[in-house]
Swiss-Prot record:
Stored CDD domains: GT35_Glycogen_Phosphorylase
Protein name per UniProt: Alpha-glucan phosphorylase, H isozyme
Family: Belongs to the glycogen phosphorylase family.
Reaction(s) catalysed by this chain's protein: [(1->4)-alpha-D-glucosyl](n) + phosphate = [(1->4)-alpha-D-glucosyl](n-1) + alpha-D-glucose 1-phosphate
Keyword Manganese appears in the UniProt entry: no
Taxonomic lineage from the root: Eukaryota, Viridiplantae, Streptophyta, Embryophyta, Tracheophyta
Pfam families assigned: Phosphorylase
Natural source organism: Triticum aestivum
């Protein structure tokens, strides 16, 4: 049956009346010609509903654009190669406060809103924490009415879909645009030329200019981002690469040379084909650099266009005004090319001199660091850079030269440090540009993402710069949006919170959650809290059954670790712990087993396609699960499940249903973590190390409500040295767990290389670099404390309540408010 058979179509702008909304949905089903008008299945219902909601968004988005144009406030532009948006429908109707109206409207067609929302594909234009942080930030920027936009790339295929096969993880292209995205608006009026390769021309008056090479176009797609209960909607502008008709060689085509006729078109397609193309080859590296430049150049041309558009007289200059109207935030070093690109546009296109251009650039750009892992600090080959971006390389060389001169002339005492602080590393074997150094030298502010991480930046990674620019360095502890990560993903718990706080204002003022503390021992609250958790656990159990076929018991302790698979995050320690638990259960008498706290250990996450040890870890979790879950002696007390294809919408099911969550990285290595905040907010207790934001979470929720173990960050270097010097004595339990795997208890796959990475000096020559062996005994002891605590239901529910109550600090509204005041210098600009 078609939508029109059920509800009369109406083009009227959507209102908040369910009948009018139903008419509007029916209208979109009929007149947005994506599907046959005869059928109205759940998929069609999703697209028609989304288009109807988009009408609301567009109204706000247009109003906001005009309001910003008229009032001309200072505006922030967030440059990020990644956004992990996930699904948008539930969030959009929630933020617009029209969830009930849309739920009622859909009932007229016989549909539940939740089921229709489940039809949407995740927009996974990011890898992990950094990308999801960018998405939480957009939600907070809109909610706080801040004049700010995000810029990114419109990848054709997002983060790969993960399938678990016999050999382990398989990657499949994630086709989020398979049909189309109802949320994006293609902007044929917003197009900028982007040049690659070519050469630098010098005119008779000595002016330098980039010319030649090939020129593609950047075409804008706008995704409106609604704030929570505000009229403001901001923009996430995603760039796609295109070539023009002029680039199509009709002569060659008619001559049968089809491929060479459309060469530039196919090169344009490559730019935004995939998120993070493999960079093991030179081609892969070049493509990644092209992507980065494409984002930076298109965004800066657009920013300059808008700067001029908002006041007619800016066409003729007033560049010193630019930093009072524009703030550019670089999300890690991936958009570092914004620095030389802004310099180039100001000097070569707008005609400024170096000093003037440098002053403007320096006052405009700021840099957030998200990692201290040496292998994750970007370095680009000078040769590749020279070939692809010859004019930018000149500018970078000049920045490097001037920085050296400045240090030599003003800081004699720092001379010995210059080589490591320089932007260029001229090591003859492999000359590179150090992108983080460029960001520190050129930006006005550098920030880390949690207290501990920011201190490590100041004391270690960037210590030398601190002595030159003591005021450049800041901390901005990460946050998460309480809308998506409690209000919308956990409606049961949200209702309880609202009921006990007697207000739902916590949704945009998360500090109000502390008001729950005074009810932490209230038996009525305990009963409601436990019932909500059980409902979420059942939903989680259904998801697990659907995607893995494994039945798990909602009365067991749900213990979850979900995040990218990485050795520093130590999923391997988790699974060794599960193996040890399994072995002890096997050795126990049946009577003793009955005293054990039943547990379901769940692990989820994607391994980078070429990261061999991470893929081995995925395989090991699956292999351990296959044995344990089918062992009738013990599977009442332990299940081990690998959750495939972890993504934002899976997180929205898993986090509310978890009770214990693992954040167990080697201290000093996880810059912040943000899922730790989501778990804690949803009343889940953390077992973790003193790393990243765990430190601050533990402070906020109280040390009794956090299971702490492991070495501290300042011990790690010494422990590694001891280990190298043969001073490490492994705990017998650690040896036992490894030996059990080596014995073949979990199948015939060869885990030797993985386990060897935990031994002496064999792990890539750095022997258990992540200190699994050192932390294992205290981890096992902490897990034993968890088992005991869980037996006391009252105690556990209280810990759970106090975790939620102590999570107020971790709202991204707080984080963004601090960025706005302390880095960007922008203020709210609400649409009247
Ligand atoms: C940290 N991703 C978390 C989170 O601040 C932190 C790196 C290279 C290329 C592509 N993506 C990346 C990251 O570095 C990343 O996700 N970093 C994470 O940023 C937000 O909470 O501790 O590991």
């Amino acid at each position: 049956m078609s939508a029109a058979d059920k509800v009369k179509p109406a083009a009227s702008p959507a209102s908040e009346d369910p009948s009018a909304i139903a008419g509007n949905i029916s209208y979109h089903a009929q007149y947005s010609p994506h599907f046959s008008p005869l059928a109205f299945g759940p998929e069609q219902a999703f697209y028609a509903t989304a288009e109807s909601v988009r009408d609301h968004l567009l109204q706000r988005w247009n109003d906001t654009y005009l309001h910003f144009h008229k009032t001309d406030p200072k505006q922030t532009y967030y440059l990020s190669m990644e956004y992990l948006q996930g699904r948008a429908l539930t969030n959009a109707v929630g933020n617009l406060a029209i969830t009930g109206a849309y739920a009622d409207a859909l009932k007229k067609f016989g549909y539940e809103l939740e089921a229709i929302a489940g039809q949407e594909r995740d927009a996974a234009l990011g890898n992990g924490g950094l990308g999801r942080l960018a998405s939480c930030f957009l939600d907070s920027m809109a909610t706080l009415n801040l004049p700010s936009w995000g810029y990114g790339l419109r990848y054709r295929y997002g983060l790969f879909k993960q399938r678990i096969a016999k050999e382990g993880q398989e990657e499949i292209a994630e086709d989020w645009l398979d049909k189309f995205s109802p949320w994006e608006i293609v902007r044929h009026d917003v197009v900028y030329p982007i040049r690659f390769f070519g050469h630098v021309e010098i005119s008779p008056d000595g002016k330098r200019k980039w010319a030649g090479g090939e020129v593609l176009n950047a075409l804008a797609y706008d995704v409106p981002i609604p704030g929570y209960k505000t009229k403001n909607a901001i923009s996430l502008r995603l760039w796609d690469a295109t070539a023009t008709a002029e680039d199509f060689n009709l002569f060659q085509f008619n001559d049968g040379q089809y491929e060479s006729a459309a060469q530039l078109h196919s090169r344009a397609q490559q730019i935004c084909a995939v998120l993070y193309p493999g960079d093991a080859t030179e081609e892969g590296k070049l493509l990644r650099l092209k992507q980065q430049y494409f984002l930076c150049s298109a965004s800066l041309q657009d920013i300059i266009f808008r700067f001029k558009e908002r006041k007619a007289d800016r066409v003729s200059g007033k560049w010193s005004e630019f930093p009072s109207k524009v703030a550019v935030q670089m999300n890690d070093t991936h958009p570092t090319l914004a620095i030389p690109e802004l310099m180039r546009l100001l000097m070569d296109v707008e005609g400024l001199g170096w000093d003037e251009a440098w002053a403007v650039t320096n006052k405009t750009v700021a840099y957030t660091n998200h990692t201290v892992l040496p292998e994750a600090l970007e370095k680009w080959s000078q040769a590749v850079m020279k070939k692809l971006l010859p004019r930018h390389m000149e500018i970078i060389e000049e920045i490097d030269k001037r920085f050296r001169e400045m240090v030599i002339s003003t800081r004699k005492d720092m001379e010995g440090k210059i080589e490591s602080m320089r932007v260029l590393d001229n090591n003859p074997e492999k000359p590179v540009v150090r992108m983080a150094n460029l960001c520190v030298v050129a930006g006005h502010t550098v920030n880390g993402v949690a207290e501990l991480h920011s201190n490590i930046l100041k004391q270690e990674l960037f210590a030398d710069y601190v002595s030159i620019w003591p005021n450049k360095f800041q901390n901005k502890t990460n946050g998460i949006t309480p809308r998506r990560w409690l209000r919308f993903c956990n409606p049961e718990l949200s209702e309880i919170v609202t009921k006990w706080l007697k207000t739902d204002q916590w949704t945009s003022n998360l500090d109000l959650l502390t008001g729950l503390r005074k009810f932490a021992d209230d038996e009525k609250l305990h009963a409601e809290w436990a019932a909500a958790k059980l409902a979420s656990k059942k939903r989680l159990a259904k998801h697990v059954l659907d995607v893995t076929g494994v039945t798990i018991d909602p009365d067991s302790l749900f213990d979850i670790q979900i995040k990218r698979i990485h050795e520093y995050k130590r999923q391997l320690m988790n699974i060794l712990g599960a193996v040890y638990r399994y072995k002890k259960l096997k050795e126990m008498s049946a009577a003793d087993r009955q005293k054990v706290t039943p547990r379901t250990v769940m692990v989820g996450g994607k391994a980078f396609a070429t990261y061999t040890n991470a893929k081995r870890i995925v395989k090991l979790v699956n292999d351990v699960g296959a044995v344990v879950n089918n062992d009738a002696d013990v599977n009442k007390y332990l299940k081990v499940v690998f959750i495939p294809n972890y993504n934002v919408s899976v997180a929205e099911v898993l986090i509310p249903g978890s009770e214990l969550s693992q954040h167990i990285s080697t201290a000093g290595m996880e810059a912040s973590g943000t899922s730790n905040m989501k778990f804690s907010l949803n009343g889940c207790v953390i077992i973790g190390t003193l790393d990243g934001a765990n430190v601050e979470i533990r402070e906020e929720v109280g040390q009794d409500n956090f299971f702490l173990f492991g070495a501290k960050a300042d011990q790690v270097a010494g422990l590694r040295k001891d280990r190298e010097n043969g001073l490490f004595k492994p705990d017998p339990r650690f040896e036992e767990a490894k030996q059990f795997i080596r014995s073949g208890a979990f199948g015939t796959y060869d885990y030797t290389p993985l386990l060897d990475s935990l031994e002496g000096n064999t792990g890539f020559g750095r022997g258990d670099y992540f200190l699994v062996g050192y932390d294992f005994p205290s981890y096992i002891d902490a897990q034993a404390r968890v088992d005991e605590a869980y037996k006391d239901k009252k105690k556990w529910v209280k810990m759970s309540i106090l975790n939620t109550a102590g999570s107020g600090k971790f709202s991204s509204d707080r984080t963004i408010d601090q960025y706005a005041k302390e880095i960007w210098g922008i203020s709210a600009c609400p649409v009247p």
